[in-house]
Amino acid sequence: MHLIAVSINHRTADVALREKVAFKDDAIRSANVDLYETKSILENVILSTCNRTEVYAVADQIHTGRYYIQRFLARSFGLDVEDIKNMTEVKVGDEAVKHLLQVTSGLDSVVLGETQILGQIRNAFFLAQEEDTTGTIFNHLFKQAITFAKKAHNETDIADNAVSVSYAAVELSKKVFGKVNNKQALIIGAGDMSELSLLNLIGSGVTDITIVNRTLSKAQDLAMKHHVKFEPMESLPRLLVDVDIVISSTSSENYIVTNEMLQSISTERKHDSLVMIDIAVPRDIEPNIDTIHDMFSYDVDDLKGLVDANLRERQLAAEQIIQNIPNEIEAHNEWVNMLGVVPVIRALREKAMSIQEDTMDSIDRKLPGLSERERKIISKHTKSIINQMLKDPIKQAKELSSDKKSNEKLELFQSIFDIEAENAYEAKKQKNNMKTGQILSFE
């Protein structure tokens, strides 16, 4: 059996292409089932977010698994298989495990270390579980990856520092005020950066937010979308009297907030602190307003220094996490190797217990006068003999799991004891017209 990860992400396809190959939320369940019914696929989990569409699968063979996954994606989105091949990364074996660990812990995200992907991976796994498209391998591997990511975020600072300008703007406000949930915020502009700033403010607990924009309808649309207030640009001087935080991002060629405007309202503010963060280029806020008492201004250069420093911190944290990935891969492989041993040991125990039961039946026939107490004593001792006899063979079987030729040696082990281990994938293998009775080999 082989682990395969087929990924369409921000490295392999631009946003226009990624939009074409994103599963809608209500289509993920049926997509998992459709893929599971595909030849060669034994387990699968589908992950689809704004930045990536990925298929994780356990397949009977690498080349057929990869082919059927890519064909499935092409069919799902009405594209040619060659188009899908050109926009996918394919990882197999240990590299597939490594990829899942990196994705889950935010190391493969557009924003290094972001935590949203962890929840998305968890949801994708749970959905697949509910549709019975996961089995022994993925039920273990995805839980391992989720646990690893949680531990990575708890033990490092990878998600603690802002690495986007809009997020840094809000973080800077927190540095000035401490808590911002009780502050009033004003956003000047209604473009993408303004919306990101708005979302970060909302995420930080700010509820009193007003948007102003030269085109009032755009301010209204954005405000209604996120349930905040909006005002015309003409209201700006009046709004500046009461707000605590201003984030400005317009495409204006002239200053939106001027020294003169701020001087005129400074006495009305009663010396309450006003933090103004200008993320526009060219700048929206006239420089040198710091000369006005209790007013503080920051521009993109100030934020860039914060973002760069934070990114360096995240990169250092990422390096710590990366160092732990080989240990996780090794732990996974050790667990997988034991999978081949468990059914062998079970078969050995079942045969031994069958012999013990047959022996007790023979004793009952030959010694019908045994009391219940005597029978229990004999049964206990025969079981004890069997357990003692099995101790060394079971120990040897477990040690075979780490051998490079474990499959061959386990087959010999079964032959010596005349046992046949059950295969967890028997039904699926029959569907795929594969030979039955093999010991699983994972890569």
From Swiss-Prot:
First-level EC class: oxidoreductase
Reactions catalysed, as given in the entry: (S)-4-amino-5-oxopentanoate + tRNA(Glu) + NADP(+) = L-glutamyl-tRNA(Glu) + NADPH + H(+)
Pfam family, one: GlutR_dimer
Domain of life: Bacteria
Annotated active site: 50
One of the GO biological process terms: protoporphyrinogen IX biosynthetic process
Binding site for substrate: 49-52, 109, 114-116, 120
Family annotation (CDD domains): NAD_bind_Glutamyl_tRNA_reduct
InterPro entries, per the entry: 4pyrrol_synth_GluRdtase, 4pyrrol_synth_GluRdtase_dimer, 4pyrrol_synth_GluRdtase_N, GluRdtase_CS, GluRdtase_dimer_dom_sf, GluRdtase_N_sf, NAD(P)-bd_dom_sf, Shikm_DH/Glu-tRNA_Rdtase
Subunit and interaction comment: Homodimer.
Family: Belongs to the glutamyl-tRNA reductase family.
Purpose of the protein: Catalyzes the NADPH-dependent reduction of glutamyl-tRNA(Glu) to glutamate 1-semialdehyde (GSA).
Protein name: Glutamyl-tRNA reductase
Originating organism: Staphylococcus saprophyticus subsp. saprophyticus (strain ATCC 15305 / DSM 20229 / NCIMB 8711 / NCTC 7292 / S-41)
Lineage: Bacteria, Bacillati, Bacillota, Bacilli, Bacillales
Gene this chain is encoded by: hemA
